[in-house]
A protein has these predicted regions:
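Short gly/ser/thr-rich secondary-structure transition/capping motifs
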Residues: 46-52, 106, 127-128, 258
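Active-site-adjacent beta->alpha loops and helix N-cap segments on the catalytic face
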Residues: 130-141
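Central regulatory/effector-binding core of bacterial HTH transcription factors
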Residues: 87-132
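N-terminal helix-turn-helix DNA-binding module of bacterial transcription factors
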Residues: 1-63
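Bacterial carbohydrate/catabolite-sensing allosteric modules
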Residues: 3, 46, 87-92, 140-147, ...
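Short, surface-exposed alpha-helical segments at coil->helix boundaries
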Residues: 37, 79-83, 135, 199-210
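Short beta-strand segments enriched in small/hydrophobic residues
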Residues: 14, 21, 58-74, 181-195
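N-terminal helix-turn-helix/winged-helix DNA-binding helices
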Residues: 2-7, 45-83, 92, 102, ...
Length: 278
């Protein structure tokens, strides 16, 4: 006999037992004979029975699901972090529901609302949004929220490294290695900031770079927001007696820069240095 997906009531009737007995069998609880349990499980498979987890979650007040709203997964840093979160969640009996904002604040809002409608037990957010209105929206959801990478405000639990201090340490380390000209690569920073996107983390890196230069007495430095090949190659080949290093705010532009220099016969690290934050 062929069945379509059935309800717990239909499965109980087919097995000749109560709904409570079916519930004990499919959830592996005590108070039921092994032979009865096996019969119910066999019938459940034949009848394609699927427990209504949403109804169950409403009854117990939790879905054992965590929502993750990330920027994207093209950056290896985000991909590895999301994978680690998923593995840890599963070890604690939770599954994750993932949505990507693709650097679009509107898509981020849609994703957050989606998670709330699915009654996730909490949201791990890589925020693009910022400000009082955004914070108020999140608080009204009544869902525990942890932010990663960009900070919103102190009311939310935040997980990140001290980007500002780390970048100061980077400048100090490079100065000790003999580099005396440090060019900072920060693609599209002002465009993102003026567009209302949360740039807290990368702004802290930029501030740390500038503070590091001041501490090492290396002048005002040079910040580039466009990955212009002619300009970058020109700087790298400039014969001015300076030992140059390009500091990239993350590894993505660092990899692009290495490829660009290799194609233009610029040796790394013999001719210039490259370092990425991530």
């Amino acid at each position: 006999m062929i069945y379509i997906s059935c309800t717990i009531k239909e499965l109980a009737k087919a097995c000749g037992v109560s709904e409570g007995t079916v519930d004990r069998a499919v959830n592996n609880r005590s108070g039921i004979r092994e032979s009865t349990k096996q019969h119910i499980l066999e019938m459940a498979e034949q009848m394609d029975y699927r427990p209504n987890h949403l109804a169950k979650s409403l009854a117990i007040g939790g879905t054992k699901t965590i929502g993750i709203v990330s920027v994207d997964l093209s950056n290896n840093f985000f991909a590895l972090l999301v994978e680690s979160i998923e593995q840890t969640a599963r070890e604690h009996g939770y599954f994750v529901n993932l949505a990507l904002s693709h650097n679009d604040p509107e898509k981020e809002m849609e994703a957050i609302k989606y998670m709330a409608e699915r009654r996730v037990d909490g949201i791990i957010l890589f925020p693009l949004g910022k400000g009082v209105e955004f914070s108020s929206f999140l608080k009204k959801l009544g869902i525990p929220i942890v932010t990663i990478y960009n900070r919103i405000e102190c009311d939310f639990v935040h997980v990140d490294v001290d980007c500002r201090q780390i970048m100061r340490n980077v400048v100090s380390f490079l100065a000790q290695k003999g580099y005396n000209e440090m060019i900072y690569i920060d693609p599209h920073f002002e465009k993102m900031k003026s567009g209302g996107i949360n740039v807290f983390s990368i702004e802290q890196r930029r501030i740390g770079y500038l503070e590091g230069l001041k501490e090492e007495m290396l002048g005002d430095g040079e910040i580039l927001e466009d990955m212009d090949e002619r300009q970058l190659v020109g700087i790298a080949k400039r014969k001015d007696g300076m030992r140059k290093v390009f500091i990239c705010r993350n590894d993505t532009p660092a990899v692009r820069l290495m490829t660009m220099f290799r194609e233009n016969n610029i040796r790394v690290p013999e001719d210039v240095g490259i370092i990425g934050f991530d």
